[in-house]
C-alpha cells in the first residue's frame, strides 16, 4: 500500500484523541489566482461568532513537482500526495446524463492526473448496490475500467413523469377545468395534497439514502486508509434536491392558488399558503444535508460537484417520457434550481466548487486540478461543546476572515462534533 501521509506535522484531527479543528483554505486574488506568502497573523477564525486562537498554520503544495510559481520556498517544497475520490451518484443520475459526462471523466483520469495523484472510484448504483475500487491508486487503467461499469438510473425520469401524471389526474387537471362543484373541487385538491406528500416522501427517502451512503463511504475511507490531509471528492450527479419532491408540491400549490377561499377551506387549506413558501423550509431534508456536510467537514473532505444535466433541466417530468406538468415558468425555474441546490450547498459548505449549467466538463476537471494545487491550513483547539449539542448533531459554524483587503477566501462553513 502506498504511503498515506498527506503532509508532515499535521495535528490530529477528529480522531480518537481529538486535539485540533483544521480548516483548509483556498485564498485567491480578484483574478482567481492563489495568493502565496500569507502568514497566520493575516487570518482570523471564528466559531459560532467567537474568535478562536490560531494554534496551527501551514501551506500545503499538491501541484506537480515541476510547477514553478516564482516563489523559491514554494517551488522547492515537495509535492504532497493528493487523494481524489470520484463519486458517481447513480441513484439521481439518468443514463443519458451519465453518458454525457463519462467520456470527459474517462479522458481526464487516463491523461490528466499528476504523478502525485491517488484516485479511488466509488459509485452508488440504482439498485442500492455500492461499488468501489479497492484502494487509492495511481493506476488510471483500474479506475477507467471501473468507470465503464457504472450505471445510471433508468427509472428515475420515467417514474417522476408517471407520478406527475397520476397527481394531475387526481386533481382533474387533464380533463376538468372547473364546473362550479366546490365539494368536488375540494376533494380533488385534498387528494392532490395527500398524494404530493407521498411522492415527496419517496423522493426524500431516495435522497437521504444517497447521503447516508456518502457518509458510510467517508467512514469507510477514514477507517481503512487513515489519510491525514484533505480528500478531494469529485461528485457527479444528476441533481441533489434541497427540497425533495418540490415539483409535486408546486403542482398542488398552483392549483390551490386558483381555488376560491371556500374550496381551500373545504380541502383543509383554509388560509392558503404554498406548501413550500420558500426554499429551505423543508427542515427534515435541510437537517439531513447539513448533518452530512458537517460530517464531511469533520473528516476533511472537499467536494467539487458536477451537475451531469449540463445546460438546465430538472427531475420534473419531461415530454420525452409522456408527460410534462403545466407549471408556470416561475415554478418550473424553482424546480430546476432546486435540483442544483444540494450540489451547490455541499460544494460551497465544504470549501469546494460546483459546476452546473455547463457542458464543458473537461474545463471543470481542469479547474479542480488548478483549485487544489495549493492550500493554507489553519487550526485551533477544539472547544468544549455542550453534550446536548453533540447528541443533537449540531452544526458548529466556522468563519475565516483575512486582514488583507481584496482577498477571496473559500473554506468549509462548519462541522459536526461527534464527541469521539
Please report, for each region that a protein language model flagged, where it lies by residue:
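Scaffold/interface architecture of coatomer-like assemblies
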Residues: 1-420
